[in-house]
Amino acid sequence: MKWANLLFTSLLFLSSNAIASGVGFTQITLTDDPKRPLNTAIWYPTQEVSNTTLIGDNPAFVGTKIIKDAQIQSSTFPVVLLSHGYRGNWRNQNWLATEIAKRGYIVAAADHPGTTTFDHSLKQAAKWWERPRDMSRILDHLLTSARWKQHVNADNVTAIGHSLGGWTVMQLAGAKVDRQTFKSRCLIYPNPRTCGLAEELGLAKVQAHEPSSKDLSDPRIKRVVTLDLGLAGSFSINSLNDITVPTLILAAGIDIGDLPQALESGYIAEHIPLYSRRYKVYENATHFSFIQDCKQGAEVILEDEVPGDGIICKDGVGTSREELHQLILNDIVSFLNR
């Protein structure tokens, strides 16, 4: 019943706040840390409607229509920060970013160095603490850049992450990495996918230049949303118990073999105080139902490129990814409007 009420609220929100005529889009590189430049994509409301182009579109995946480098609409807008999964990129949640921007948000996402499609640097990947810092750096830019600062509502900032991105945004909310907890969990649940990444992601042992404090929270983040997150077992239970930031936990009901939601999303839902979180499982969704939609024939294309990658296009029987995306979008917009 709570979710039904929230959905009704969201429909009212959509009708009263869908003020943008189009979605503007731009890409920048953040160089405030020269050792970790951030390729960043930004979607935003615009009154412009002409000269649309497709982004994130290729033979396998469906893109979205945007207006490149359009003038931002004259107003202030809440902010959503997006974090992609392991070896993903901003295009994975392009569908979500575009829809949220249509509804009056500035949305920004970076390709995390070391764990993105186009950068597999082991040195960068092992700097696990830099992922949440990447998100804080993006917000710093939006709040200080001449182009954006007058358009940002600094009191309304949400962070959303898929898979490893969900793990990233949980740290912004106050979750703290604890190696002993992770080691113990891996002895009980030796998942080769999550436990097998411990070395690469710098979680097996203390890294050079690792911050002494595991608290990477950012008080400017007012809400977080996780989309079938992974590596939840690396968080200390005490830190999850202490989270007060409103948290929406969305999970895939179909286990494709490496991220069972009961041990990942379910773990954080179990330990975050009930008053701080909402938890929903989409029974017909897989881990990849949260990324962009596949075109007809995409499964064959992906399988030919990398055997086994065809699974990226699989959803539950009798359910389309487009339908799942609409459900996910409705739930996220409802949460944003709380």
PLM feature spans:
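Domain-level recognition of soluble alpha/beta enzyme cores
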Residues: 20-81, 261, 298
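Short amphipathic alpha-helix adjacent to the substrate-entry channel of hydrolases
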Residues: 72-76, 88-111
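The conserved beta1-alpha1 loop
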Residues: 78-85, 111, 251-252
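Catalytic nucleophile-loop/oxyanion-hole region of alpha/beta-hydrolase
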Residues: 87-99, 116-137
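Alpha/beta-hydrolase active-site loop
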Residues: 124-150, 154, 167, 171, ...
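Short beta-strand/loop motif that positions the catalytic acidic residue
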Residues: 243, 249-251
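Catalytic active-site module of serine/aspartate enzymes centered on a nucleophile-bearing elbow/loop
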Residues: 296-338
